[in-house]
Swiss-Prot record:
Residues 19-769 are virion surface. Residues 137-147 have a biased composition (Basic and acidic residues). It comes from Gallid herpesvirus 2 (strain RB-1b) (GaHV-2). Pfam families: Herpes_glycoH_C (PF17488), Herpes_glycop_H (PF02489). This is Envelope glycoprotein H.
């Protein structure tokens, strides 16, 4: 399957079947497979019960598996075909059908013998040298106590839920029977790697995701589960969990039992690992052991999902290399797999599952798999795909979606009534169930709720009143994600997304970048020193969404280092690290890596939402030197770069270091290049309800060519603060605040740029009384010291002169 050899084999079979080849030509085909004993080719289509003792035949889901048990090069080969075709079949007359040859057959024919086969399923015995920890059932991602069902709030059916439960899902519990219905579906596990005899199991869900760099298949049941990880840059590997009562056998050598990794584990299931061990690298063996340890550590959902986020964070903080990517990708996907296994297992043991866990599970699957595709294995994020079958019956999944739709429609009419936490619940539900992508006005409603939250948090951000806590960070992530999840060709979708990008850039100030880097450093320490439970969104920042690319410039690192004294966790960590400044540099590098890796690649975001920038730019210059992109209107964008090369109205920024030059280009089709002139002016006060500055951006830069912030003026309230000057309550707009430095430009949506003189003149004239008093006292002291010094020198000169005169007189005598 997917190999050239299989194509050749299928063509030969198809030609043979199409001609309805007579009996006497059959041996020529069988001789190709090395089959001399014709009866050994068994086409038994009995039911499962009727052939339970015969592992040479299976019928599952309208498919018959045909096993070749002859002593031949094809020994142990498994074929499978539609049962309807098999039922019409006689041994000597086969109808035209799609007969699929297993990878085993093709590999076997290509390699010639089992001994030289490059993909052996055996692995050196694994034995733990440490004691297996017990389940850490008390571990949670937050400080809240887990809610439990009570007599007045028992587990219920999904049909009894109400829209209010979407904004308060933690206290609603669903019966486990709602996951599967009255009867659990039994299916046949056909090993994607074609190594194992098919296994019958109670199936709950299948998840397939990947990109052009990798593909992962997860199959999860009640007593059986498997994950197959395939990559372009590494051999595939498969992890299987099976109840102890079930034996796992290899297809070849014929029906040979496949030994579990460790028979003596205390877990209720056995662990099987399939992967190459001949010439396996240390990284391969290390990843195998880590995968096994992730199974043995705990069967608690909270622990496993916390470890998934921790490993994803470590992956993001790890320097890019093929070896690191392969290892980390396997570790993260295995942890995600184990969290799903734990969720299903716990639900069937307890008889219920919380409504919140159902929604969080779907959101985690999407967020984690999509994040992996953003930076792992040199993948193109545009090739990411996710095929996730829910662990709910279709009609029950529709009930949940209907609840979410009603909640969104109601919330869009009055977003002010929702708290940050309720925004989080609603937007996470919409994201998890792809509500933004549904037809009708639902996408517009979700975008409306998301944008209102972004506007509210932006207002708090510029006023320095925002609490960057867990709820705010998570809610903001899902708000942006829900907007970008909406198809861009829908009415108003692209305009909303461009506005969201402006808000993200406005919140990504110089101070916020520094604060976020320090928060990331603290999380890294928590994971590595304390092994505390974390969530990757605990360090989410608008800078991840913003089209600001100067995050890793050196001045941010210097500011972060100077603020370390305000973070005791980091300070203590560095004090205990003998590497000194190298340890601090390492933490800074990891923080920058996390932000950079979590960002959607610039060209992908621009291609979708700011195509005029891509059209009017040299791609190499854009990716190499762009510092900031502001899609300021529906048709045009500002691009700030270090080099010329963007076609549009080009402004050469004066007053900056010649070695760190800034160019601002207003880009709009048809990409006509002209020279712009930045005009200095005093902003006139608008009359009445006019809002001439609404939609503008206040950009501030320093004389060394560094961008400080880009504040989006989105409302009349912010316009009033802008023109209030020294009376403004927003420090970004108040020239009298001492720490404000640099030049301020106002960028208009039509491509006009002006330099605001108020900031420059105020910076010269506004001097604090404390500064004047200190300077005067210092000058007085300096003058006094100078006078005393001069007097001492004069006295010393006089004294020496008199001594000289006395000596002269003595010589004369």
């Amino acid at each position: 399957m997917g190999l050239p050899g299989s194509i050749v084999f299928l063509i030969m079979i198809h030609a043979f079947c199409a001609k309805k080849t007579p009996t006497n030509t059959l041996p020529s085909l069988l001789s190709l497979l090395g089959i001399t004993d014709l009866p050994s080719l068994r086409l038994n289509i009995l039911s499962l019960d009727g052939s339970a003792n015969n592992q040479g035949s299976w019928v599952r889901d309208n498919t018959t598996f045909v096993y070749i048990g002859a002593s031949s090069p094809a020994n142990g080969v498994l074929f499978y075909m539609p049962t309807s075709h098999v039922q019409q079949m006689t041994f000597y007359k086969r109808p035209v059908s799609k007969l699929l040859a297993s990878n085993n057959l093709i590999k076997f024919l290509n390699t010639g013998s089992y001994i030289n086969h490059s993909f052996m399923t055996a692995m050196p015995p694994y034995r733990r040298n440490v004691q297996i920890p017990s389940d850490r059932s008390g571990l949670k991602l937050d400080d809240k106590d887990d809610a439990q069902p009570t007599g007045t709030n028992p587990p219920t059916e999904l049909k009894n839920l109400k829209p209010i439960d979407v904004v308060n899902p933690e206290h609603r519990f669903i019966l486990t029977s709602e996951l599967t219905g009255t009867y659990v579906k039994h299916v046949c596990f056909v090993d994607p790697m074609d190594m194992l005899i098919p296994v019958d199991y109670a199936h709950i869900r299948t998840i397939i995701f990947g990109s052009d760099g990798a593909e992962v298949i997860m199959k999860i049941g009640i007593t059986f589960a498997s994950i197959t990880i395939s990559m372009k840059s590494a051999p595939p590997v498969e992890l299987i969990l099976s109840e102890r009562a079930r034996n796992i056998s290899l297809i070849w050598p014929a029906l040979k039992p496949y030994e579990p990794v460790d028979k003596f584990t205390r877990r209720p299931y056995l662990i099987y690992l399939l992967g190459p061990h001949m010439n396996a690298s240390d990284m391969e063996i290390k990843s195998y052991i880590n995968m096994i340890e992730s199974v043995e550590e705990s069967s608690n959902y909270d622990f496993q999902i916390a470890q998934t986020h921790a490993q994803l964070f470590i992956f993001a903080a790890t320097p890019i290399s093929d070896i690191n990517d392969i290892y980390c990708f396997r570790v993260v996907t295995t942890r995600l797999f184990m969290s799903l296994v734990a969720s299903v297992r716990n639900a069937f043991q307890s008889g219920y599952i919380s409504f919140d866990e159902i929604i969080k599970t779907e959101a985690n699957i999407k967020m984690i798999t999509e994040t992996l595709s953003t930076f792992a294995l040199h993948s193109n994020p545009g090739t990411y795909f996710l095929l996730s079958g829910m662990h709910l019956r279709n009609e029950n999944a529709d009930i949940i979606k209907s609840l979410i739709r009603k909640t969104i429609i109601n919330a869009s009419k009055n977003t002010a009534s929702l708290s940050i936490l309720q925004h989080l619940y609603v937007l996470r539900s919409a994201y998890a169930f792809n509500i933004s992508q549904e037809s009708g006005n639902l996408g517009e409603h979700v975008s409306s709720i998301s944008l209102e939250l972004i506007i509210a948090l932006h207002e708090e951000s510029v006023r320095d009143t925002i609490a960057w806590n867990t709820s705010a960070r998570h809610a903001l992530y899902y708000a942006f994600a829900s907007i970008f999840q909406r198809p861009p060709n829908e009415w108003d979708a692209s305009r909303t997304a461009r506005k969201a990008l402006l808000f993200a850039s406005s919140m990504c100030t110089e101070e916020h970048i520094v604060a976020t880097e320090l928060v990331i450093q603290e999380m890294y320490i928590k994971i590595n020193v304390k092994n505390s439970p974390v969530h990757i969104l605990d360090v989410y920042t608008p800078c991840v969404t913003a089209l600001r690319m100067d995050i890793s410039e050196h001045h941010h690192r210097l500011y972060a280092m100077s603020d370390v004294i305000l973070h005791p966790v980091i300070e203590k960590y560095l004090e205990n690290d003998s590497r000194g400044i190298d340890a601090e540099e390492e933490l800074e590098t990891k923080a920058e890596l996390v932000i950079t890796k979590l960002k959607t690649p610039l060209m992908r975001r621009l291609t979708i939402y700011a195509s005029e920038v891509v059209t009017c730019s040299d791609a190499d210059i854009l990716e190499a030197t762009a510092l900031l992109v502001l899609p300021i209107s529906g048709l045009g964008s500002y691009v700030v770069t270090r080099q010329l090369g963007i076609r549009g109205i080009v402004y050469n920024v004066d007053g900056v270091d010649v070695n760190n030059q800034l160019y601002i280009t207003y880009v709009r089709l048809p990409c006509t290049t002209t020279a712009g002139n930045i005009v200095p002016m005093v902003l006139p006060r608008p009359l009445g309800s006019d809002c001439p500055y609404c939609g503008c951006v206040l950009l501030r830069y320093s004389t060394n060519g560094n961008l400080r912030h880009t504040i989006y003026i989105s409302s009349q309230d912010l316009q009033r603060e802008l023109i209030a000057g020294g009376n403004s309550s927003i420090r970004y707009f108040n020239p009298t605040i001492a720490q404000i430095y640099g030049t301020s430009l106002l960028l208009y949506p039509n491509g006009t740029i002006v330099r605001i003189l108020a900031f420059e003149s105020e910076r010269v004239t506004i001097i604090s009384a404390t500064y004047v008093a200190t300077a005067t006292a210092g000058a007085s002291i300096a003058i006094s010291i100078a006078i005393i010094t001069v007097r001492m020198r004069i006295n010393n000169f006089r004294y020496n002169y008199h001594r000289y005169k006395k000596l002269s007189l003595y010589d004369d005598l």
